[in-house]
């Protein structure tokens, strides 16, 4: 699996550079994303602009990974879905379970709001 990682102040922007995210890549996906939970900056924005197909098993894995981030008080936002991937996720009923934004900028806004929310609930 090809990825590009850009580290920002409050999150890591990870771009999947493979055209297909398939079931046989779920373990590799977890191995790529879950270690970020051990870093000081835990938040992840997953950019899927180069991915034209995500099968159901890979999508279910993304939902589980996202839940793992939220269980560990970190944000996980997916952005820049291609229309085909968005339709596929919607048809499978998984899109509504995911934290998805159209752009990386909006993903940053979500992370910022979730950080404020976590601070308020921890007081």
Walk through the language-model features, giving the residues of each:
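Structural signal for conserved beta-strand scaffold positions within catalytic alpha/beta enzyme cores
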Residues: 15, 100-102
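A charged, well-structured terminal subsegment
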Residues: 102-123
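Residues that form or immediately flank small-molecule/cofactor binding pockets and catalytic motifs
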Residues: 10, 83, 105
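Amphipathic alpha-helical interaction surfaces in cytosolic regulatory modules
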Residues: 26-98
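STAS-typified acidic loop motif
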Residues: 2-37
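General small-molecule cofactor/ligand-binding pocket signal
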Residues: 6, 79, 101
